[in-house]
């Protein structure tokens, strides 16, 4: 077994006291902007946790494609594992981990589909090859071979060799509207800082609690 004790290093100094924040979205935006400058890969990557009909959890990395005070948005195939699980149980948890900053943000909330207009607008911004891939992929289904996938991609590419690629009807997005947002920052000797914002429903006022690490 690898001894990870020596991998621990001193937390970089940061300015300000994030525990003084009185609402979560502005704090999240500040942390995300700092992560964009610091993280080498995908600062908008987040772990998305859902639950299947048997109560067995699923988790996977996805990319957040937008956020505001209404919630956190991501896109995928509606018939994928995550899409089916969210249709059956529209609740989810998210985790952002920014290793370079020694920070993480945990989010729990209710999930609703984005509008067709939102999905269309985002899909139009994707590179054409990614748009073609969305048509060719039957996400979460069994795939015979990589060659079969490449054939499907080539077939779609030939169909849309000229002009715009429309959004597939089975591809859309979801918005996670949070009722819990927790901010955690590493400190020396595991004496970390941790605060949680909570509310019972969207639109209500947030309450803040400082938590033991």
Curated annotation (Swiss-Prot):
SUPFAM superfamilies documented for this protein: FMN-binding split barrel
Pathway: Cofactor metabolism; pyridoxal 5'-phosphate salvage; pyridoxal 5'-phosphate from pyridoxamine 5'-phosphate: step 1/1; Cofactor metabolism; pyridoxal 5'-phosphate salvage; pyridoxal 5'-phosphate from pyridoxine 5'-phosphate: step 1/1
Gene3D superfamilies recorded: Electron Transport, Fmn-binding Protein, Chain A (2.30.110.10)
Keyword Coiled coil (UniProt): no
Entry keywords, A to Z: Flavoprotein, FMN, Oxidoreductase, Pyridoxine biosynthesis
GO biological process, one term: pyridoxine biosynthetic process
This protein's name: Pyridoxine/pyridoxamine 5'-phosphate oxidase
């Amino acid at each position: 077994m690898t001894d990870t004790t020596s991998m621990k290093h001193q937390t970089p100094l940061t300015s300000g006291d994030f525990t003084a924040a009185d609402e979560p979205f502005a704090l999240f935006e500040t942390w995300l902007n700092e992560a964009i400058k610091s993280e080498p890969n995908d600062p908008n990557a987040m772990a998305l946790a859902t639950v299947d009909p048997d109560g067995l959890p699923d988790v996977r990395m996805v990319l957040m494609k937008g956020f505001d005070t209404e919630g956190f948005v991501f896109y995928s195939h509606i018939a994928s594992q995550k899409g089916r699980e969210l249709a059956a149980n529209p609740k989810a948890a998210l985790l952002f981990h920014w290793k370079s900053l020694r920070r993480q943000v945990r989010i729990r909330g209710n999930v609703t589909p984005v509008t067709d207009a939102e999905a269309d607008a985002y899909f139009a911004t994707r590179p054409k090859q990614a748009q073609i891939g969305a048509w060719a992929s039957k996400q979460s289904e069994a795939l015979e071979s990589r060659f079969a996938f490449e054939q499907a991609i080539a077939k779609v590419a030939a169909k849309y060799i000229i002009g715009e690629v429309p959004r597939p009807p089975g591809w859309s997005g979801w918005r996670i509207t949070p009722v819990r947002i927790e901010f955690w920052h590493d400190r020396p000797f595991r004496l970390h800082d941790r605060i949680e914002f909570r509310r019972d429903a969207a639109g209500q006022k947030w309450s803040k609690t400082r938590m033991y690490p």
